């Protein structure tokens, strides 16, 4: 319940701006309550009331209104004018406000540059893969401008635990239903610190028809990394939700970049190669050309947030931080791996990439081939008639790996470590529109990308349809 002194102070601040007679009385009372709640939640009104009353040289409410207006980039009037009322009615982050790009008090930050995250539960508003893609994209926003990297955990504790909840949801800071507070997050540290919570009473969307999950997640994860709110209306870390119309062209403002780099420094000029000597790529007619319109790939896999495109003795290493991919000999990273590999895929939960050539396969972690490899593909359960794998992909959400051989495919259960019964099945049955001659495949942003010759097909595994057809080397900005 609001205290009488506070209500009287609110009346002093507001009566001159809004007459309290007739039909406007109820609306004015509602606006006053909204303002008081806003100042208490985001500008520490109750904490400072006694201090201001003792001084008796200004109204704490008027001063707080001025502080709020200045921070939000409004005209500083000290009154609840129409522009101020419009802003405080908008949906926003639940974390309190401070000025310019800011970090939490004491400047908490992670003491390591590789962080883990876990999506604890899901909103029913979106398919799971759409939630996964939004969170992954939100993390990439910060990864691109810092040395930070992220990997996902599917069980146990992660540095950043991401969850959806309504009202009272376990942290003593309840949500308020649809609108107003969209989400909140905690500064870096152990336990609940670093975690991000999203109000599931909101209508979460992939576009701007409701509340865009990617935009809110990118903002909240900024808090999880140590940033507080910015007074710059162009910044992602501005507290009031701003629905960008062109999500495909979204970029951090310089204010956001300055803030996060004040904590972690800039992104490295190129990915860290962990001391592996780089063998120069020899020139010659046999060297594949990145923007060759007829370029095809032998295999493609992700590796710790990067994408590896294999071709003959070489591979391109594509980081989302850098437009230009690196080009290396396979032997410069993994001397014992063969050239012209057949298939490759990453199991993120095991931090392992598997490479296939003929009837053998290898397991690599980072720059090291694991002991006990190569092994026969028949140890995975394939019949002896299978002599090579054309392409493979591991679905991180379903924890299934798909192996494509000619016009059929097998499915492997990563939990049970065995091929599933009922396979093989024809590719055309479950992947309509996909050329059965598959050279390579990998997953990104909730889609499967199938490569056949010089073209690729973006496939939605939930809708079971091809959504785009592109050139194979479009990932190289060709």
Swiss-Prot record:
Zn(2+) 2 binds at residues 93, 219, 223, 229. Ca(2+) 1 binds at residues 125, 200, 202. This is Stromelysin-1. Residues 18-100 form a propeptide. Its EC number is 3.4.24.17. It comes from Oryctolagus cuniculus (Rabbit). Residues 1-17 form the signal peptide. Keywords: Calcium, Collagen degradation, Disulfide bond, Extracellular matrix, Hydrolase, Immunity, Innate immunity, Metal-binding, Metalloprotease, Protease, Repeat, Secreted, Signal, Zinc, Zymogen. A motif (Cysteine switch) lies at residues 91-98. Disulfide bonds join 291-478. Hemopexin repeats lie at residues 288-337, 338-384, 386-434, 435-478. GO terms for biological process: cellular response to amino acid stimulus; cellular response to reactive oxygen species; cellular response to UV-A; collagen catabolic process; extracellular matrix organization; innate immune response; negative regulation of phosphatidylinositol 3-kinase/protein kinase B signal transduction; negative regulation of reactive oxygen species metabolic process. Ca(2+) 4 binds at residues 298, 390, 439. GO terms for cellular component: cytosol; extracellular matrix; extracellular region; mitochondrion.
